[in-house]
Amino acid sequence: MLRDTYIGLVDDSFIGKHVKLAGWIDSIRDHGGVLFIDLRDKEGKLQAVLEESGNKELYDIAKHFKEESVVLVEGLVRRRPSGTENPKIKSGNVELLIERIELLNASETLPFPIDDNVDISEELRLKYRYLDLRRPKFQKAIKTRSKALKITRDFFEENGFYEIETPFLIKSTPEGARDFLVPSRLHPGKFYALPQSPQLFKQILMISGFDRYFQIARCFRDEDLRSDRQPEFTQIDFEMSFVEEQDIMEISEKLLSKLFLELLDIELSTPFKRITYKEAMERYGSDKPDTRFGLELVDLSDIFKNTNFNVFKSAIEQKGIIKAIKINKILSRKEIDNLTEYVKGLGAKGLAWGKIENGEFSSPIAKFLTEEEIKAMLSRLEAKDQDMIFFSADKPKNVYKILGNLRLQLGKMLNLIDESKFAFLWVVDFPMFEYNEEEGRLEAMHHPFTSPKTEDLDKIKYIVDKSDKEDIINIGENIGARAYDIVLNGVEIGGGSIRIHKQDIQKLVFKILNITDEEAAMKFGFLLEALKYGAPPHGGLAFGFDRLMAMMLGFDSIRDVIAFPKTQKGTCLLTGAPDVVSDKQLKELHIKIT
């Protein structure tokens, strides 16, 4: 080894010892005859001192070294002079008196300083990601990620799970997003797909009798990217046989409790709160509600069922709803206009509002409402002086979208969110299907392998043979799924379900989703075949590991907790991927670019 120990591990116990260290020059300062060189490696920093009086030749060479150059140093560890200690670092009581220094590799002038407090464009950061990763906060993030993976593996091993790798080159079975396709050289015209999840393989592992499986799974989805999306990402994936929803939830809570305790020294209160999908939508306008603050939606539909106000009347006649949010502050005209533009961006035609000043309700819509309606509305909202109310009247789906997002916007705007809090929540009792208006059909709310609730199996069998579209939609949207999502601070960090383990039920679900027998056999024939040979009841869950790490460490984007992330356009600025390939490579793959 070139070194005796790590730079950041040198402390009081090394006083009086000669050591050999290797690392980077974090900073270098010339104090006229004395060079102060802060050395750095993965464990931390250490101040080193080179005195001109001790070795002028070495001093004259070292004073020209640049920051971030790599050096090998030897010297004596001594106590720092009284009053110069640095309590912020482990080595803050000591320093290294340099007797020898060797430049292992010089650094050119950096495109940006290695400093957490400097604002750097993300484009520049990702181009020089290896420099960006030297910054303390990203060193901490990647190290914490590594520790989290170890904790996760240890946890599952202690609980009787097997870590089993599933294939990367698989059959294309789209699960919602587009697949990344890989052409086969040996089978011209045929393609592998990269897995969007290990879903089918982990179910087959349960059929194989392994009982408990887990994997730190790499997943790939060719989709439009946002701050919480990457084309390749990591999941903590697990599956269990002979279980019910409660069993999956308990193991999930235990894992999260272990991660939070060991990484953040935070003790989580379990079991986590549970809320049904219906309640989440009605109260918060979202199936992943942020429960760190109030501003719940209030239903006013019954109050305005006989109203003459055309906007509300039209909504009721079209089987819509009327809901409102109340805040304890009267906003300025400019703030109201900004919120109006915001909800218009979500598809709203406008934003109806009202306020209470000096005990009087005033609103642009007040003249269309009766005194009885206003009185009943204010009573339902428990409104008082200096309160403001925002309304939405439309189909339930649209109202929830508008008010759910408006609620979050108001929460941030009014500083109602406690950013130091971790609010966990299980959302349960999801519908099995939802209606896709564009395609005019039912689609799976989670995925087609989710088991329906036992009490709704007859509905599944009933609508398969129905031809009346409205009947199919009405019944289909009221079939419950044995699905569950885990939400943290308004972000879904994991989701799962009890799976279908009987072939006949799986075939019926495929039919409801307009997947023909031929298409099902072509895409999922291997699963249907496996379900014939004694498949046990089973279920599982997958955590979005990148997202979980970002939230635990206080980052807004998952890109900050991934060593080499892609941009929002799916490019790697470090390597230049994706890129063109040679004609020879394309020819071998029997591919022509047009």
Swiss-Prot record:
UniProt-listed Enzyme Commission number(s): 6.1.1.23
GO function terms (MF aspect): aspartate-tRNA ligase activity; aspartate-tRNA(Asn) ligase activity; ATP binding; nucleic acid binding
UniProt keyword annotations, A-Z: Aminoacyl-tRNA synthetase, ATP-binding, Cytoplasm, Ligase, Nucleotide-binding, Protein biosynthesis
GO cellular component terms, A-Z: cytoplasm
Region (Aspartate): 199-202
Binding site for ATP: 221-223, 230, 492, 544-547
Stored InterPro entries: Aa-tRNA-synt_II, aa-tRNA-synth_II, aa-tRNA-synth_II/BPL/LPL, Asp-tRNA-ligase_1, Asp-tRNA-ligase_1_N, Asp/Asn-tRNA-synth_IIb, AspRS_core, GAD-like_sf
Protein name: Aspartate--tRNA(Asp/Asn) ligase
